[in-house]
Every structure is written in structure tokens, then in C-alpha cells.
Design a protein with these regions (language model features):
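Bacterial N-terminal signal peptides that target proteins for export
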Residues: 1-9
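N-terminal signal peptide c-region/cleavage motif recognized by signal peptidases
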Residues: 19-21
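N-terminal (or domain-start) structured segment
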Residues: 24-116, 154, 162, 175-204, ...
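Hinge/capping helix and adjacent helix->loop/strand transition within the periplasmic-binding protein
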Residues: 27, 59, 81-92, 104-192, ...
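A ligand-binding cleft/hinge motif common to bilobed small-molecule-binding domains
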Residues: 98-108, 167, 171-176, 203-238, ...
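C-terminal lobe and pocket-closing loops
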Residues: 125, 211-280, 310-313
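Mature extracytoplasmic/periplasmic domains
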Residues: 286-306
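Extracellular/periplasmic bilobal clamshell ligand-binding domains
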Residues: 300-322
Length: 322
């Protein structure tokens, strides 16, 4: 009897191992969805569609990737869904935004943390910029700050939501200038925040460089400063906030990439971690991203894991007491 039981256990284990091996070898055998926790037209949606455009190539994944927009509550709706309901089978990934989802998890009120997900690879590094409408009376960052100091809490400044990179930059600017802005989180993400600036609904905005670059190319906005350690190649004429006299670093820079839910099979993670960086570095992707003013920064899984951990430390200190 014991011999029969042992044989049955070994047979079951062998079948499970064979099934796992077969799954890893066949994966993916159907299209893969990528959830974007923002509406269509914003920087994350725009870039996600570009960086996944060659997924169907046989030397990449051999299956196309489609986008699932799940906007709402400043990204919370999409990431809550991804952490609690998305199947952990490799056929549903999500775009991540750092510092956004980590900052939200630090402040609470969400169902996820950095430990809820497994990073795959990073595609971009998109710094925050300060923008004003094309006809704004403000032409320099100093003029905007002077107005904020003279009118505490009345310098309306749009951003994509609470605790996104835009909000982090606003908090840093307030601390550096010892003044108070009126930060206005929009419901429609970066695209809505930019529309508020262009339409004159707010005096200024903090947005992604990629969105601002396209808006400036269209003649709709002026870019006053970039929240990074050095000037960006896409807007070399625009000074950093440090150059304007404000002690603001690059903590608000928005890193974007792909992740899967915790519990995804290791062999699937390994395959994605190998192939996704190749997808991001494809020549067609790089050309389209450059044309759209979207800075790229490709990082592998190990580099992203370190970046997540480092950013969490910085954000916990920055958000302390808020």
C-alpha cells in the first residue's frame, strides 16, 4: 500500500513538473493585456502603446499586447484591481508609475504595496516640468514663485492626481520656496491636467516632460523648469529647478515600466524579464518614443527592484507628516 502511495505521489509530481515545463515553453500562446491605471491620451497610455508595438514579433514574445485602460481615483482603481483581481498567469501585466503607486501605498487607503507586484522591466524616465499657458504673464520660474509668495495658496497648479510625480514636485517646490501653491489634482490624469493649463483653468501646471513637449511643439504652453538634476535633451533651453534657485532634486521623476501580480509563475517572470527589455530597445520603439518627446531609460528586472526599494526610502522621508 505504501509503495502504491509513493508511486502515485511521484507520478503526480512528474505530471506537475511536465505541465510547468510545457507552460513555460508554450507561453505566451495568446495575446497579453497591459492595464494602464490612467485614461487614454495621457503619457503612460501614449507610451505603453508605443513600447509594446513590436510584442508580436517572433523574436520578442510572438503574441501582440493590447492596452486595458482602468482609470479612476488617481490610479488607485486600476492598481487595486491589478493587486486583488488580475490573474497571476502572465496574460495580464500592468504599467507601473514610480513614485505614484509607491507613494500611494505609503499614505494608505489602497490595497497594494510594492510587495504586491513583481517588476519586469523599466522603459522610461519622465521628469516633471512646470508649465504655463502660451499667453501666461509668467515667463520664468522666478516670476511664478514671486506670484506664489505674494498670493499664498492662490497660485492654482494642476497635476495628474495626489502623490503622483507632479504632486511630489509641487511639495518639493513649496518646501524650497517657502511658499504655498494651490495644487489641483485632476480626475483625468496628465491629459486633463494639461488641458486645464491650456484652457486657462489654472495659472500653472506640473506635468510630464513628454506631455509638455508635445504641447509646446503645438504652441500651447511654455515650459518654465524641469524637476531633474540636469537639463533634458528634449528641452535643452529649459533650466532645472535647481538652476532657478530652488533646491529640488529628481525625486519626482516618473519611472514607467511593466509588472505582473505577485504569484505569477517564476518561469513566466523569467521569460518576460528576458524578452521585454528587447521589446523596449527595438529600433522602431526608440524612433517613435523620440518623436513623441518621451525619454527612455531601459532597466532590467534587478535594476528595477533596486530602484523601487531606493524610491520607497526617499518617499517615506519626503511624505512624513503629510
Amino acid at each position: 500500500m505504501k509503495k502504491l502511495f509513493k508511486t502515485a505521489v511521484l507520478a503526480t509530481a512528474a505530471l506537475a513538473l511536465a505541465a510547468t515545463g510545457s507552460f513555460a515553453g508554450d507561453y505566451p500562446d495568446r495575446p497579453i493585456g497591459v492595464a494602464v491605471s490612467y485614461g487614454a491620451g495621457g503619457a503612460t497610455d501614449f507610451q505603453a502603446r508605443i513600447v509594446t508595438m513590436v510584442a508580436g514579433n517572433e523574436d520578442i514574445l510572438g503574441q501582440p499586447i493590447y492596452i486595458l485602460n482602468k482609470p479612476g481615483a488617481g490610479g488607485r482603481k486600476g492598481w487595486n484591481w491589478f493587486a486583488t483581481e488580475a490573474p497571476a498567469d502572465g496574460y495580464t501585466m500592468s504599467a507601473y508609475n514610480i513614485p505614484h503607486f509607491i507613494a500611494q501605498s505609503i499614505k494608505g487607503g489602497v490595497k497594494y504595496s510594492a510587495d504586491s507586484f513583481e517588476p519586469i522591466a523599466n522603459w522610461g524616465s519622465d521628469p516633471a516640468v512646470v508649465v504655463v499657458g502660451k499667453d501666461s504673464k509668467f515667463n520664468t520660474m522666478q516670476e511664478l514663485i514671486d506670484h506664489a509668495k505674494a498670493n499664498p495658496g492662490k497660485t492654482t497648479t494642476s497635476g495628474a492626481g495626489l502623490f503622483v510625480g507632479h504632486h511630489i514636485a509641487a511639495l518639493q517646490i513649496e518646501k524650497a520656496c517657502e511658499c504655498k501653491l494651490a495644487y489641483v489634482p485632476t480626475k483625468g490624469g496628465g491629459a486633463a491636467a494639461m488641458k486645464a493649463v491650456i484652457g486657462g483653468e489654472v495659472l500653472a501646471g506640473i506635468n510630464n516632460l513628454s506631455d509638455a513637449f508635445r504641447a509646446r511643439e503645438a504652441g500651447n504652453v511654455k515650459i518654465l523648469a524641469v524637476a531633474d538634476l540636469e537639463r533634458n535633451d528634449f528641452i535643452k533651453d529649459v533650466p532645472t529647478l535647481k538652476e532657478t534657485g530652488l533646491d529640488v532634486d529628481n525625486s519626482s521623476v516618473n519611472f514607467r515600466g511593466l509588472m505582473v501580480p505577485k504569484g505569477t509563475p517564476p518561469e513566466v517572470i523569467d521569460k518576460l524579464a528576458k524578452q521585454v527589455p528587447l521589446m523596449f530597445s527595438h529600433a522602431r520603439v526608440a524612433k517613435r518614443m523620440k518623436a513623441g518627446g518621451s525619454p527612455m531609460k531601459i532597466m532590467n528586472r534587478e535594476e528595477v527592484q533596486k530602484m523601487w526599494a531606493d524610491r520607497e526610502v526617499v518617499l517615506k522621508e519626503l511624505l512624513k507628516g503629510l
